[in-house]
Amino acid sequence: MVLNRYALITNCNHKTLGLYYLWFSFLFGTYGFLLSVILRTELYSSSLRIIAQENVNLYNMIFTIHGIIMIFFNIMPGLFGGFGNYYLPILCGSSELAYPRINSISLLLQPIAFILVILSTAAEFGGGTGWTLYPPLSTSLMSLSPVAVDVIIIGLLVSGIASIMSSLNFVTTVLHLRAKGLSLGVLSVSTWSIIITSIMLLLTLPVLTGGVLMLLSDLHFNTLFFDPTFAGDPILYQHLFWFFGHPEVYILILPAFGVISHVISTNYCRSLFGNQSMILAMGCIAVLGSVVWVHHMYTTGLEVDTRAFFTSTTILISIPTGTKVFNWLCTYMSSNFGITHSSSLLCLLFICTFTFGGTTGVILGNGAIDIALHDTYYVIAHFHFVLSIGAIIALFTCVSFFQESFFGKTLRENTLIVLWSILFFIGVILTFLPMHFLGFNVMPRRIPDYPDALNGWNMICSIGSTMTLFGLLIFK
């Protein structure tokens, strides 16, 4: 595909914009990944290694930016923006998205939002609040630079506007521009994954927007929404944030489900086992995932019956998720092809890691167990197995499988991608599997130092991180 020098700001073609989303995703993701390598270098052994004692807030700033970038600027643009823009019109028989120019604007807002978030590092103390921006830390004028929190909030707002525009575009395209005679009931699992993701974004992003705007007004306009000294409530912010924050996890992983379903179905030359149940399972995941946000807040002093409700609802999500894994495996086992392409291997790796991450999620969903494991490395291990391994493998599966469609030629040979897959998989398993043991040893997250007794597991984690870096260099 030949592009002129102004194509980025003038092109409205959905395929071109989808490719730009992918390029932005890999560019931003590489930056975020290198930040995580800095964190693992610091945690290679106990005591401070590369961060000075008087500048320990730098560690907070790094993991804050790492989290925001990987969630909002790596996985979302790659799977939802890239795969959705490129293939949604094709899969529903449309020649173009409903609003091509709005689609172009939503792409251009992504690098603007990224630059705003990165600018927070230029402030004197940075915005070391964690990606959750919890008050009263984020509204404190003593330990942080208010301007750093400002630009992070504005960056998230700009990114949210871009996501809402894309979501409206996708839903309108499917409802009004699909091919004649193509009913909603016969749309593919991949198409439904993008539709359900778009609906979740439209329902939850306004709540996040309201929450961070209240935070901004607390910082600069003398409101007291989250200040307990004047009858404000910091827990209110947690409710507002996690009402978006937990569905966001499914917003990230549902397009990955669509990619994996499409690749498995195509590679094994058969329709998915239980095709309609796969769509129903995604709908159930979306509904249940939107009403379980309080499981992030078990330690905030909830009543017992509240904990019981959210524990049971959280564990209930494992039923539709298990349905999807079962159907994928049935489709694979009913085929005689075996692993014929690197994307088939990546799909199996996704299923393994996602299943393991989901199992640890069921453990953490239990209110009694979570009180012991809350804010330990067990939590980090859980969500990185689902996101850092699961969603990222789905992103690479997408590029590996569709590379001829995307670029008109095979950029990487099958053998090289298989080699990268194995090296990457071993690296991430070495990085995140020992974190479960660190969590059981109650190593707190977001702290750059730890007892000497935990040196061994942390050393293995850091070696795995380095191995993942080498694997990424092979794929480049």
From Swiss-Prot:
- List GO terms (cellular component aspect): mitochondrial inner membrane
Binding site residues for Cu cation: H246, H295, H296
Task: Write out the pathway annotation from the protein's UniProt entry.
Answer: Energy metabolism; oxidative phosphorylation
Task: List required co-factors.
Answer: heme; Cu cation
The free-text cofactor remark is: Binds 2 heme A groups non-covalently per subunit. Binds a copper B center.
Question: Which reactions appear under catalytic activity for this entry?
Answer: 4 Fe(II)-[cytochrome c] + O2 + 8 H(+)(in) = 4 Fe(III)-[cytochrome c] + 2 H2O + 4 H(+)(out)
Q: How does it sit in the membrane?
A: Multi-pass membrane protein
List ligand-binding residues for heme a3. Answer: H382
Organism superkingdom:
Eukaryota
Q: What is its EC number?
A: 7.1.1.9
* Residues binding Fe(II)-heme a: H66, H384
Q: Which residues bind O2?
A: Y250
Compartments (UniProt record): Mitochondrion inner membrane
The first-level EC class reads translocase
Give the GO biological process terms.
electron transport coupled proton transport; mitochondrial electron transport, cytochrome c to oxygen
Q: Which InterPro entries match?
A: Cyt_c_oxase-like_su1_dom, Cyt_c_oxase-like_su1_sf, Cyt_C_Oxase_1, Cyt_c_Oxase_su1_BS
Residues binding Mg(2+), per UniProt? H374, D375
Q: Where is this cross-link: 1'-histidyl-3'-tyrosine (His-Tyr)?
A: H246-Y250
General function of this protein:
Component of the cytochrome c oxidase, the last enzyme in the mitochondrial electron transport chain which drives oxidative phosphorylation. The respiratory chain contains 3 multisubunit complexes succinate dehydrogenase (complex II, CII), ubiquinol-cytochrome c oxidoreductase (cytochrome b-c1 complex, complex III, CIII) and cytochrome c oxidase (complex IV, CIV), that cooperate to transfer electrons derived from NADH and succinate to molecular oxygen, creating an electrochemical gradient over the inner membrane that drives transmembrane transport and the ATP synthase.
Q: Indicate the quaternary assembly.
A: Component of the cytochrome c oxidase (complex IV, CIV), a multisubunit enzyme composed of a catalytic core of 3 subunits and several supernumerary subunits. The complex exists as a monomer or a dimer and forms supercomplexes (SCs) in the inner mitochondrial membrane with ubiquinol-cytochrome c oxidoreductase (cytochrome b-c1 complex, complex III, CIII).
Protein name as annotated: Cytochrome c oxidase subunit 1
Gene of this entry: COI
